[in-house]
Each structure stands twice: as structure tokens, then as C-alpha cells.
């Protein structure tokens, strides 16, 4: 190998991370502010070698460098015998045509739904040898066995997990991932600060997994019934860090899915043109904080939606400050509302409280419209407050008092 070529990272005996570090990406799914990784894994059995997932189109040079390095380390012939494709999405399958071209005799193991998806994405695979798998199916690599577990809609219809039995490693694809990009030799959860890891884990769940929360709980039940839960020693997702403490992330997912992660916390989201709605937002915050409620404030001039929904995930209440423009809500508010519609936060075990407020001219109505939208998104709207132009001291006092009242409702909420 050339000195500058990418190196593999060993994660267990005969198992290597051979993925890609994407230091520069900032807009994949709109929330990769710290970059991301496209994790791929090699499993060396005594007789066969399996490659689990791959990388985004145009990024495969790193992956090939790491794959070659792993083969050299193992002293094995450069030959991939088994290709496992846990998920169709291009950040995990983009190099599949290259891999198939280089190793045309290697069968591609995936779900039945994935076969059609892969052929649609990559017409060059139309004659590839696909092996359709179902939950419980296995492939023997010689001393190492891979077991497949279908996971439809976690998070695409084609998704599946792969479990390396003897090593206790669950290759979970997108589930349990995070959009983080740390150096190749820092692949494990324990290699980075815990608060960074868990914050990224919460953000990933909020933006990708929230609408699937009921399926998450159902899949955990299935894993328990199959007797796999106690066998999992490590979780190797397709983005970010590898979990050597799998129960930490499993519990986090359970708490997110059931609402048990919720704190006495409120998220205030607002935009403003002439700072009237901003003044109201700050007054609401003071009222909430006076009762000991944690407050997170987002100003849509500068803040983006993926950070906002991360904080909504463990909050009990949201407040939306809405300026009126031509008798309609300010456009930036509409953006986040449409995003919330898809995320369906009411599937996470409880309904979060909501308050809408804002300044208006003319006939107004934006506050009521967003209240209606929030109700459709699964929030319990308990108050609306709309006023003309610049708020007076009395009106700001009203905002403060409504914040205090909301704080009391938050404290009364019990999530079982």
C-alpha cells in the first residue's frame, strides 16, 4: 500500500471497519454539521470473507484502501465471497456496482424488497446473483456465522440487520447511528466524549426514527423473543461510532420511543421581523424559567430544523412564535411545521403541550393557523396569544404569566 492510502480499523478478531470518513458533508439529510461516516465492515471467516454494506457513490477510494489493508493484515487472498446489503439507500450501497464488477461471483444477500430497489438504483446489477433472506436465515463463513433479521421500515421497507453470532456483533445499518466524523482509529463509543455521542444519537433518532417509534419497540420485542438481546456485545451501525456498551443506546431508544426521555423542558421556536415576536418569546422564557423549567430557544433566522427537533424529542412542551405576513404565518415557521408533520412526535408515547403566540398587523390569524397545524401534528395546543404590533408592558407580563402557567402543566405531566 502507498503510505497515504486509507487504513482499516480492527474492531474484533477477524472483523474490520473499512468505511469512509466524510469530513466535509454538511447537508446530507440536512443535519450533518459534524460530517459523517459511511461504515462498512469486513468479516473474515476461515473459508469465506463477507463485506457488510459499503459507501456513498464517488467516495469508494477510502473504502478500497481499507479493504486491501485488512486483507494484507489477515494474509488472505484478495477476494470477497459474500456481499451483505442491509439497506438500499445510496450512502450504504453506492459502491455496490464496483464491488459486483470486481467480484461478480459473490452473491448479494438482502431482503426481497431490496432486490428490486437495488436493481432500480443500479441497472448494472440486473444480472447479479441475489440471495433473498428472511429473519433467521444464516450464512456460514467458516467458524463465523451471520444471521439475518428483517427490519422493515427501520428505516426503509428494505432494511435488515445482520448479526455475527460468535462475536455478538449486530450490524444494524442506520439504526443506532449518529452523524459524527472522528478519526479512523477512534471508532468506538468510548473513544469520544459521552455527551457528544449521546447528543448526536438523540439528533439522529429525532430526525430519522421518531415516526417509527412504535416499530422500534416492536423490533425490540422480537429481538428478545429470538433470544438475541443478551447475546449482543457490540452494535456496529452504518454511521458514526460503534457501541461497545449496546444497552446504553438500546435504553436510549426505548426511552425516546416511550416518552420516558422527556424532561421538565420547553422548546421555544420563533421568527421575527421587527422584534415584537422576539420580545414575546423572551417573556415566555422568563415565566417558564421562574418555575424551574429548562428552556431551549431557537431563532429561525439562524437555527435549522434538525437541531430543533432534537430538543423537542426530550421536551414536554413547545412554543411557537409566529409573525404575520399578509395574514399568513411567516414562511420559516411553515418549513418547520411541515417537517413536524412527517416526524409524528405523538408516536413517542405522549402528546407534548403546545402554545402559539405572535405579533400581527391587519386581521392576523397566523397564530391560530399554526395552532391548528400543531394539533394535526399531534401536539396538545393549550394556549394562543396574538397581539397588535409592538407588545406593551402589560402584554409582555401576560406572556410571562402564561409561561408560568405552562410550567405548572409541565410539572404535572406524568409519563409512565
UniProtKB/Swiss-Prot annotation:
SMART domains noted in UniProt: Lactamase_B, PAS
Binding site for Fe cation 1: 87, 89, 155, 174
Binding site for FMN: 272-277, 324-327, 359-364
MF annotations from Gene Ontology: electron transfer activity; FMN binding; metal ion binding; oxidoreductase activity
Gene3D superfamilies membership: 3.40.50.360, Ribonuclease Z/Hydroxyacylglutathione hydrolase-like
Binding-site residues, Fe cation 2: 91-92, 174, 239
Pfam families the UniProt entry points to: Flavodoxin_1 (PF00258), ODP (PF19583)
InterPro entries referenced in this protein's UniProt entry, alphabetically: Flavodoxin/NO_synth, Flavoprotein-like_sf, Metallo-B-lactamas, ODP_dom, PAS, RibonucZ/Hydroxyglut_hydro, Rubredoxin-O_OxRdtase
Cofactor (UniProt): FMN; Fe cation
Cofactor binding, note field: Binds 1 FMN per subunit.
UniProt keyword terms in alphabetical order: Electron transport, Flavoprotein, FMN, Iron, Metal-binding, Oxidoreductase, Transport
The organism's place on the tree of life at top rank: Archaea
Reaction equations catalysed: 2 reduced coenzyme F420-(gamma-L-Glu)(n) + O2 = 2 oxidized coenzyme F420-(gamma-L-Glu)(n) + 2 H2O + 2 H(+)
CDD domains referenced in this protein's UniProt entry, alphabetically: flavodiiron_proteins_MBL-fold
Domain Flavodoxin-like residue range list: 266-407
EC numbers: 1.5.3.22
Database matches in PANTHER family: ANAEROBIC NITRIC OXIDE REDUCTASE FLAVORUBREDOXIN (PTHR43717:SF1)
Job of this protein: Catalyzes the oxidation of F420H(2) with O(2). May be involved in O(2) detoxification, reducing the intracellular O(2) concentration to a level allowing growth at the expense of methane formation.
Family per record: In the N-terminal section; belongs to the zinc metallo-hydrolase group 3 family.
The protein's name: Coenzyme F420H(2) oxidase
Higher taxonomy: Archaea, Methanobacteriati, Methanobacteriota, Methanomada group, Methanococci
